[in-house]
Amino acid sequence: MAQTTLDDWAKDPVDPEIRAHVHSLITALGGIGDDGTYSLGDDALLCLKDLRKWLKFGDGQLNRRDVARCMAEANLVKGDLLEILAKISPKAIEDKWRHKIAVAALELLVPLTWPFEIDPIEATVNHHRHGPYIQLAQIGYKRAILQFDRDRTLQTAVKIALPSMAVPLRERTPRDEGIIRIALYFIRNIAMLSPPTSAPMDIDEAEVSRSATIDTFHEQDIFQVLLSVASSIGEDFVAQDVIVLEILFFLLKGIDAEKLFMEDKKLGTKNADELKNLMQKEKAMLAGYARNAPTRHNRFGTMIWVKRDDEKVTTISGQDVLGKAQASMQKMDQTKKWNKPRRPGKKVDGEQEREEFDLPVALTVSARKHIKAFVEEFLDSSFNPLFLHLRKAIERETERVEIRHSRQFFYLASWFLRAECARRRTMKERAADPKDPAVLTAEDESYGLVAEVMNQETFILLNRFMQKSQDEKAWQDLNAGMKCFTQILLTVHEMSESALEDDQEIAENIQNRIFYEESTHDRVVMILRSYNGQGFGYLDAVTELSHVFLRMLERYAKQNVDLQVKSKRRARKIKKKVAETHGANGDEEGQVSDTEDIQQAQRTVSERKFDFQRFAAKFVNQSSVDTFVAFARYFSDLDTEQLKRIHRFFHRVAFKMELGVLLCRVDILQLFTKMMKGPGGLDPESPAYKEWDEFVRHFFRQVVKKVQERPELVVEMLFSKIPATLFFLDHGYDREITKSTPRAPAELEVKPGMEVPEQIGVAVGVLINQAKSDALHWVRDILISAAEERKAWEGAEEARKALAAAERPAGEEVAENTEEESPKPPSILVKPDSEERRLAMFKDNKLRLLMTLVGFSRLGEAHDPDATWIIPSAFTSTDLEFAIDLLRKYEFDPPTYEDGKGPEDLIRNKASAARRSTRRVDFDDDDEEAENAVEEDHGEYRAGKATERKPDGERKKLKRRQRVGTPVELDDEEKDRRAEARRKKELEKFAKQKSTEFVHDSDEEDDDDKDMEFFRREEALRTEIMKAFGKSLTAGSTETATSKKRKAEDSTSRTKRRKTPPKRKAQPFADSDDSDEDVQDAATPSSRAPSLSARDMIHDESEVEDEATDTPLSSQHANGVHESDEDTTTGATASITVKSQDVVMADDDDEEDEATPVARRPMARKRGAFIVDSDSE
């Protein structure tokens, strides 16, 4: 019986039929002949095509990966394809048949060397089964191609494509474009292949390293091909730009551009310093371990018990726990284990691993020399054409541009900018060396070689790319964008220090463009705040960007004090639309009107002066501090520049911005202590140690002082600080937050001339046009529910009345006020159906107009968003059903209006309409009176002449009265009729007025009735005064009238008494003419008396009573009203002089006066004059 092994039981991962077909084709392709050289088979070209079909069908369409594994197992690449290319390489261009075979072999090499990728969406079992084997096979392909000794395979691939490259662009066929593409893709695959991290290799990594690839590219003149293609992009080559971009990316990623252009001597010194620093770190680490390391005497071990504060005992083993209690506690903490639950994170696929550009790559001396020469030639000849063409392709989003190309574009832009800056510094150092014959020229100092990534178009594309990456959380893309932006800022900084004035002007212009956009400032702040474990490379990029941006912005803001930034904010834009005018008179209210003000929230752009302190305050917060703290935790792996970057930020937070409270957290304090005191802290011999030690000592002093001022800080050290906590710890009290009350929208009304049903139709039409049918349906549902409820109540009320009538005895009479005492139906509360509806009931003035028109009432303050809406008791079920019918009618049959107007044109702002109406009535009255003033006959009395009485003080400025109510609109006939009535009234008053200048002797014109009335009033006044005087004597008052008057005036001045004398109630000396005047003043908008509140009127009336009681002998009031020329238009008052001895009152029109509650103008001077005259008689 034959012996079997486990291999016999193992299942073949490849389908045997596929394996047989592929192996038979490879066998027929050719092999090694008797002479030791490779011999092609008779049907070699057909075999190559069949193998390509199998590869395309099996691995492309069926997605199995079986064919690629069979070809790897059969050693197709090294044993056949490379031998075929080496055999036909000398005559590949001349012989057409050989050229076809070479192209077929190259077409087969490209998919075999294409980096293996596992698509997480379309991956199958075969991908995971064959993936590691194929990856290792591809590394073998790369090693064979780079180390193949019988031919230069890469150079042969370029020779195959040379005939197609020589054809002009317009004359090339698709086959020529395909040959050029597969040759460049073959070069790209060789540069792209790297050893896998998931599978071990049995070959030397140096044979497939970056240095070996660069040396091979140099030996086989691939760099010259890349320079030729890149410099001719846009002229001879178009679709090949992205392939060249990928080749450059995989050649240059991870290479330090600073070291690349260093002099050999300086580079050796730098490498020696790095080695020294590493040895110092290792020595410090070993020294820290040696402090607690076991000695040769502890061969039996040690175990101790530690008694804690809670009387619990803990056992610790090891000699390192002996000595201090702190060492025991630290040992106890180290032995604690916490199995933190790990969430299944996103698995990093092969593409992301290949696209990683933060891992440094070491180069050999020869590789560094070759790549440096290539980069210098590329910057001189090919950088601008290639990157200009790529930027345009990315902007247009052409089909050949993929997502990864934008990331590679910005990373390479930053890399080449850094290389150019390093090259310029080296050239300046050479020029400064007297022993070096190198001399700088104007071209060497100019930055024109990298101009295509320093223009405005690139900045716009970069900003858009960074914002998109941040929104989509594509952190690798954002990392590349941040590196590019940082390097642009550093390049601009070096341009500003250039010796050429043109470069300085360009740098000033670029800085102005970058710092002008406030969105750029906000984006940098948000990127810094949003760090959440994206990796060390991302953390390094974001901290470097924030550091460089903040320092350059601070320097630029100091140089440009009047720096303006473009700010985008939410604003309210008011648009006014003027309706068409019709009719002859365009000034009439009904003919010209403005439509309602439409307020729309939109992004508005405005410029404002830049305040760096404001930006720095926004830049420094708890999230940004956490980002730098996370970066500082890698302090043992950071170089000097990175440590200084962290130190500058913490120094700004603690001392410049005086926000050291943000750093008062237990983990941050422990980190600072560990960095300085260890274990595993900073090396005291490192260049950054001194600065850090000084900062930590000052900061801890500040913390101790702050804890003494605010003991609450001890508790807050356990938590991150929010703004409210920061304010409390700084000031000792909480911030007072004042909430602004929301303002109600402007009230609307339908223009006059329409009935209520038509007005409802207008409101319904507006809501329908604004796509607010849901609000209309909600109002209708509320009305339907209210109508049913009101109808049920009315039915119950009728039943109650019928029952009461049946229980009443037959002979009992019904009381007359039964109807008045009958109960009213309860008001119905209007409830919103959602939170949006509740807000609309307050903010949507169109909806409020409809609710008001159908009968809803609003209870509460005007600006109260929570005010209640009700359906009043006055509305019966019939009224509500009528409103429902109107809503249904106008919803499906909206009314139409004349001249093509819409319902929006028929509504207006109620307050604006009231103001316009008031101004128009005033102007009409003034014009009519001015026109008719000439026609009025005042007889022998001259109107408007000033009295001889001297004024009491400086005349107060008159102000127009602000009315509370809205005046009623008047038509033309009514206005004419009222104006005519006013003119007649004024003529009658002027005819009856008598000035003291024209008063005759009383003996000539004797009127007994008037004299009797006058003496009767005087007697009544005298009696009232004596009664008041007696009451004051009875109460024991010793104050004089003058002191009481002064007290009254002082009290009124404290309560902000109005400037004009108050209204007097039922004065015995009030003329009928004066009352008429005041009624007219109250009804006429041109009246100038200020309106009074109820509190002022009550206070002034009590004050007047005191004055009338206590000052009977005062001749005139201190604050009397002085007449002016303008007062004659509303009614002339009697002119009175202090020397007058005889006064006659005109009160013939008492019967014509009508009572009115409106406050009238007081006549303080007349009362004083009458008192003096009566006493003299």
Curated annotation (Swiss-Prot):
It is found in: Nucleus. GO terms for molecular function: DNA binding. InterPro entries: Timeless (IPR044998), Timeless_N (IPR006906). Its main location: nucleus. Residues 1054-1066 have a biased composition (Basic residues). Residues 1129-1140 have a biased composition (Polar residues). One of its GO terms (biological process) is DNA replication checkpoint signaling. Residues 332-353, 576-598, 802-830, 893-1012, 1028-1177 are annotated as: Disordered. Keywords: Cell cycle, DNA damage, DNA repair, DNA replication inhibitor, Meiosis, Nucleus. Residues 586-597, 923-934, 1002-1011, 1071-1080, 1145-1155 have a biased composition (Acidic residues). Residues 893-908, 935-955, 975-1001 have a biased composition (Basic and acidic residues). GO terms for cellular component: replication fork protection complex. Belongs to the timeless family. Forms a fork protection complex (FPC) with CSM3 and which is required for chromosome segregation during meiosis and DNA damage repair. FPC coordinates leading and lagging strand synthesis and moves with the replication fork. FPC stabilizes replication forks in a configuration that is recognized by replication checkpoint sensors. PANTHER family: PROTEIN TIMELESS HOMOLOG, TIMEOUT/TIMELESS-2. Component of the fork protection complex (FPC) consisting of TOF1 and CSM3. This is Topoisomerase 1-associated factor 1.
